A protein has these predicted regions:
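Two-component/phosphorelay signaling modules centered on CheY-like receiver
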Residues: 13-31
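C-terminal output helix
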Residues: 108-117
Length: 162
């Protein structure tokens, strides 16, 4: 099975490097962006399993980036973790209202970051598997013989889902 792909988005290169290290040593593949616009461009090229997104960035902040991701059918299922030093309740609520799936306060605690990213990437993976299985069932119900004699495990393996 391939490593989960996580995008780390922060305008602070040191923070990106730190989170990259935390995630890579724990078995994740990491892509980087330094603002919301770059993040959206990356997502257009390849959908990640989760995004760790800073709030305060130039061009497009984390809240607006999350809103855009969650408003598009092709990206709304990508889990987003908002990360910020603004860790008061109003900002946590703003993160949730923007569509974020979780919230982390700076300074980043490695074990908590890894645990939340692992949880959300597993959720993303499960959603992809469920979607593929629903497609297979619908295909079989419609008389399509593409999957007729293939075991489910083989179908999921072909899709990189096991």
């Amino acid at each position: 099975m391939k490593k989960p792909l996580i995008y780390v988005v922060d305008d602070n290169k040191i923070t990106v490097k730190l989170m990259r290290r935390y995630l890579e040593v724990n078995g994740f593949e990491v892509g980087e962006a330094y603002d919301g616009v770059e993040c959206l461009e990356l997502v257009d090229k390849q959908k990640p399993d989760a995004i760790v997104l800073d709030v305060m960035m130039p061009r497009l902040d984390g809240y607006d980036t999350a809103k855009r991701l969650k408003s598009e059918a092709s990206t709304k299922e990508i889990p987003v973790v908002i990360v910020t030093a603004l860790n008061d309740v109003p900002n946590q609520i703003k993160a949730i209202d923007s569509g974020a799936d979780d919230f982390l306060s700076k300074p980043i605690e490695e074990k908590l970051l890894v645990a939340k990213v692992r949880l959300l990437s597993n959720l993303s993976f499960s959603r992809k598997r469920e979607k593929k299985l629903r497609e297979v069932v619908a295909s079989l119900q419609n008389g399509d013989k593409t999957y007729q004699w293939k075991p489910v495990d083989e179908i999921l393996q072909e899709e990189g889902l096991i």
